[in-house]
């Protein structure tokens, strides 16, 4: 768990099990540098969805700027294109910015959207238990604001959340 978010992403987006790859394999750094791969984004595009990826970290982290188009995403918005970014005391971007970015992606197209968003606020190392609790509280507020925004829109939404980091 942790120290391999790109591999967790790969498994979730493609439904491929990394056990079938070599030890220490990071498809984002190897096979996806030059090849495309079937994914939920490609499948939903075939059904008429616009596909967006959003990440409040640098585009070059795990080469996502190269990989996301090869996984079927029409657009990718990394932190370099976000305004009013706030960082937590350990330097990670706060997740609250993501609600605005998700809403922009929803507003950018007519019809159905698939928006895959990766957050970073909860990344360790945690200097103290109270710091960890504060970050969880802020992330909880972000999720509440995101749900409120989605509920105010006229289109139906499905929100799926998962994590790959333990405290």
Where are these regions (language model features)?
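Solvent-exposed soluble domains appended to multi-pass membrane proteins
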Residues: 1-167
């Amino acid at each position: 768990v942790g120290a391999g978010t790109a591999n967790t992403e790969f498994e979730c987006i493609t439904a491929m099990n990394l056990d079938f790859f070599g030890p220490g394999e990071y498809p984002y750094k190897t096979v996806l540098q030059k090849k495309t791969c079937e994914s939920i984004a490609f499948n939903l595009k075939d059904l008429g969805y616009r596909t967006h990826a959003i990440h409040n970290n640098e585009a070059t982290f795990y080469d996502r700027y190269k990989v996301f188009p090869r996984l079927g995403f029409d657009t990718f918005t990394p932190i370099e294109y976000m305004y009013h970014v706030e960082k937590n005391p350990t330097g990670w971007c706060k997740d609250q910015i993501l609600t605005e970015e998700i809403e922009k992606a929803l507003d950018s197209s007519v019809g159905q959207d698939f928006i895959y968003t990766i957050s970073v606020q909860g990344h360790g190392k945690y200097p103290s238990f109270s710091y960890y609790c504060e970050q969880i509280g802020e992330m909880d507020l972000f999720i509440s604001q995101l749900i409120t925004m989605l509920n105010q829109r006229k289109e139906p939404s499905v929100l799926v959340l998962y994590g790959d980091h333990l405290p």
